[in-house]
């Protein structure tokens, strides 16, 4: 069982801030922490704190994949020191977002009788601020979970979507439209704290680059060749959307 003194500084801060927000009467908390920082341990510790304070009865965790859901199950079971498999005597269950649609009405009627904490891992996979503007996972959350959860905790290491749709349950600033996070722990701070390593970025070249010059076209075997044998600059390459689609 993990005590608060064993938490990283950011984890302890986040637990304290989430608890304060919940106790103030607000039921949703959004934590953005860089991948690998320990979001699952933080959320499990918060869940245990809420249990110890008598603020919740049950916990549900949802994740985008079976492997992540299994990891959450193990972390919560160890931290809370209780089975976390959804069976008799368990304090909760860890499932995938895909499974929400297969949980029947009887399940939700039973769950709504209890004070429930729902943890959404990698919440950015779920979009929508209303059912008609949501993907299937976001729609299930809005329809099934939003109304029965006593508290919700959203976790994300990369809180943005390429389709620009809002993340489900998230709050955005007006008029800027920026995501409002209740707690943020970025990569720079994680590197400073020796929580994460400094990433190494590798640019993979493209072996067939073609540019148009007037009525003609020229091909190059690499970015280096393109830069040396044409008037194209490096900035031209990285700011060209079509070019970047073929470069990792």
Where are these regions (language model features)?
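Walker A/P-loop
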Residues: 24-46
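Conserved pre-motif I regulatory segment
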Residues: 1-32
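Conserved RecA-like ASCE P-loop NTPase motor core of nucleic-acid helicases/translocases
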Residues: 56-65
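Interdomain helical connector at the RecA1-RecA2 junction of SF1/SF2 helicase-like NTPases
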Residues: 164-248
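SF2 helicase catalytic motif II
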Residues: 109-153, 158
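Hydrophobic residues on the short alpha-helix immediately C-terminal to a glycine-rich phosphate/catalytic loop
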Residues: 18, 45-50
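Inter-Walker segment of RecA-like/P-loop motor cores
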Residues: 71-111
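A short beta-strand-to-loop transition that corresponds to the Sensor-1 phosphate-sensing loop
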Residues: 65, 95-99, 122, 155-159
């Amino acid at each position: 069982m993990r005590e608060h003194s064993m938490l990283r500084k950011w984890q302890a801060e986040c637990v304290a801030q989430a608890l304060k927000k919940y106790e103030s009467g607000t039921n949703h908390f959004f934590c953005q922490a860089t991948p690998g920082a320990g979001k699952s341990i933080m959320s499990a510790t918060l869940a245990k704190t809420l249990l110890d304070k008598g603020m919740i009865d049950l916990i549900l965790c949802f994740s985008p994949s079976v492997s992540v859901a299994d990891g959450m199950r193990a972390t919560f079971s160890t931290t809370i020191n209780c089975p976390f498999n959804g069976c008799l005597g368990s304090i909760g269950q860890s499932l995938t977002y895909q499974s929400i649609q297969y949980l029947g009405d009887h399940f939700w009627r039973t769950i709504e009788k209890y004070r429930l904490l729902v943890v959404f891992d990698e919440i950015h996979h779920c979009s929508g601020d209303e059912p008609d503007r949501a993907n299937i996972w976001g729609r299930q959350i809005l329809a099934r979970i939003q109304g029965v959860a006593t508290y919700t905790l959203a976790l994300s290491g990369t809180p943005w979507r390429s389709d620009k749709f809002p993340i489900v349950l998230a709050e955005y600033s007006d008029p800027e439209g920026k995501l409002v996070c209740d707690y943020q722990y970025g990569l720079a701070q994680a590197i400073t704290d020796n929580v994460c390593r400094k990433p190494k970025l590798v640019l993979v070249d493209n072996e067939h680059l073609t540019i148009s010059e007037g009525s003609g076209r020229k091909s190059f075997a690499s970015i280096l060749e393109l830069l040396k044998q044409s008037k194209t600059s490096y900035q031209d390459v990285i700011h060209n959307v079509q070019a970047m689609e073929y470069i990792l």
